[in-house]
Amino acid sequence: MIMLKYNNKLLSDNERIKKNSNFLRGTIEKDLDNNLTGGFNVDNAQLIRFHGMYQQDDRDVRLERMNQKLEPLINMMLRCRLPGGVITSQQWLNIDNFSEEQTLYSSIRLTTRQTFQLHGILKPKLKGIHQLLNKLGLDSIATAGDVNRNVICTANPMESKVHYQIWELSKKISEHLLPKSKAYAEIWLNEKKIESIDSEPILSSVYLPRKFKIAIAVPPVNDVDVYANDLGLVAIKDNTGNLIGFNVLIGGGLAMTYGDKSTYPRMASEFGYINLQDILKIVESVITVQRDWGDRYNRRHAKTKYTLVKVGIDILKKEIENRSGLKFSPMYPYKFTERGDKFGWIRGINQDYWHLTLFIENGRVCNTSNILIKKGLSEIAKVHSGFFRITTNQNLIISEIHQDKKDIIEDLLKQYGLLGDFVTSQRKSSMACVAFPTCPLAMAEAERFLPAFVTKVEHVMSKYNLQRDAIILRVTGCPNGCARAMLAEIGLTGRGIGRYNLYLGGNKNGTRIPRLYKENITEDEILHVLDITIGDWAKNRKTQESYGDYVVRAGIVRAVINSEEDFYL
């Protein structure tokens, strides 16, 4: 294998794969025709990420298949590009049918990036799902890989004029930063190959050093966890409620690598204010600076947060201003006071229409012996002429329900037990990444662990008469940050089967990273810690003081102030 060098240093092997890929084509088509294996070769398994897919296998049956001298049960996970999380009822129905009939797991997974994933797609079914998405006006381009990922924004664009405007902006940003290569259409949609020279004026022929994430938030609600992103845009309104521009945050990211203290979660830094009409120029300039300055030697240090720390805010700001031809103005005052979704019925801009946020535990839309979520949503989609909107907390909004249809849909919700009247505030404040059995990076359970674990936490809360309170609790199977555990009041990250690192001290509004409290401990040990600290909190907290704020004030953990300096202290 030929290793690429630049400035006499070895580049990451991903750089070789991208450079030799012919603008993301590789030999994917050849692998699609290879019936001897259910997967793609090593290089193509990286390239299909740029087309919105991950190669995975079912880890529950990996050993059994190995004993039978079979290759792992290789399958793909596909992630749709859905800026702002908006999907029509008809699109939902078609996706629901495909997931039911053509995937191994018959489920739809709502994600913290405000889109849906389909797990368990076998290689012969791949062209079918891409062609279905295309027929529906959707695609999965650039939802993985070293590109700008799905752009997220505060969930319900029909809540106010500003919410609608930021949804429109999320779509514009997504389109503006898409790869220009025709590889997706040629491979998956059988589009005729035209002899022409591909060009990537924004991303370059080797794309970005690592993934890039953008979020747009409307204060005072930080439902998107805006500080966790490479680029965060905080909407600023004038005195009449009109959107005038954005405070710009740069350099957030929650992933880290165990044992490597040069990696750490980091909250984005404030850079300044930019007027609405100029925001696309700034977004493009931030992307191109990261494209050119990001670390292509060590992927652990390739994210924007490390670029910022390496050169400093002042130098990075000056380069962005030079490239955009704009100047950052001072930040406008803003404040976040809450996260999470607003469950239940609300009216929006048009008083004739209703919107209902449903709790979907861990975002897993499936039918079980206890509840027919998938069937219920399918029946609603058949009579609902509006939209479904996915939230960044893995929940679902049935939106734009006309007054005339409200009773019909409410009856269906009751029939299938979807109203969630029995769901506690604590459960609504908890979420997990997928982890086992499909994620190859998972070290411990997360999605399958969380429901029973939350029940145990609820028992602790009840023990201290805290049933009406809630703690933001998040679990991930590894330290990569998918469920944003590094902005939770209680964060668990998997270390091994049945073992987790326990982090405490994040806050309610998503503006503080928690600190490691106990390392590599079992569920029983975690619950013992929580019993003691929650009991302390119940006895000694100030009025309305949250758990995360209490454990910091009480000295149970020290606040993380500047994570590149004090996260590991």
UniProtKB/Swiss-Prot annotation:
Domain of life, source organism: Bacteria
One BP annotation, GO: sulfate assimilation
GO MF, one annotated term: NADP binding
InterPro entries hit by this protein: CysI, NiRdtase/SiRdtase_haem-b_fer, Nit/Sulf_reduc_fer-like_dom_sf, NO2/SO3_Rdtase_4Fe4S_dom, NO2/SO3_Rdtase_4Fe4S_prot, NO2/SO3_Rdtase_4Fe4S_sf, NO2/SO3_Rdtase_FeS/sirohaem_BS
Binding site for siroheme: C482
Enzyme's top EC category: oxidoreductase
Positions bound to [4Fe-4S] cluster: C433, C439, C478, C482
Cofactors that this protein relies on: siroheme; [4Fe-4S] cluster
Keywords: 4Fe-4S, Amino-acid biosynthesis, Cysteine biosynthesis, Heme, Iron, Iron-sulfur, Metal-binding, NADP, Oxidoreductase
Swiss-Prot/TrEMBL catalytic activity: hydrogen sulfide + 3 NADP(+) + 3 H2O = sulfite + 3 NADPH + 4 H(+)
Pathway per the UniProt entry: Sulfur metabolism; hydrogen sulfide biosynthesis; hydrogen sulfide from sulfite (NADPH route): step 1/1
One Gene Ontology cellular component annotation held by this UniProt entry: sulfite reductase complex (NADPH)
UniProt EC number: 1.8.1.2
Keyword Ion transport: no
Keyword 4Fe-4S listed: yes
PANTHER family per the UniProt record, alphabetical: SULFITE REDUCTASE [NADPH] SUBUNIT BETA (PTHR11493:SF47), SULFITE REDUCTASE [NADPH] SUBUNIT BETA-RELATED (PTHR11493)
Family under the similarity heading: Belongs to the nitrite and sulfite reductase 4Fe-4S domain family.
Subunit structure: Alpha(8)-beta(8). The alpha component is a flavoprotein, the beta component is a hemoprotein.
Function comment: Component of the sulfite reductase complex that catalyzes the 6-electron reduction of sulfite to sulfide. This is one of several activities required for the biosynthesis of L-cysteine from sulfate.
Name listed for the protein in its UniProt record: Sulfite reductase [NADPH] hemoprotein beta-component
Organism: Blochmanniella floridana
Lineage: Bacteria, Pseudomonadati, Pseudomonadota, Gammaproteobacteria, Enterobacterales
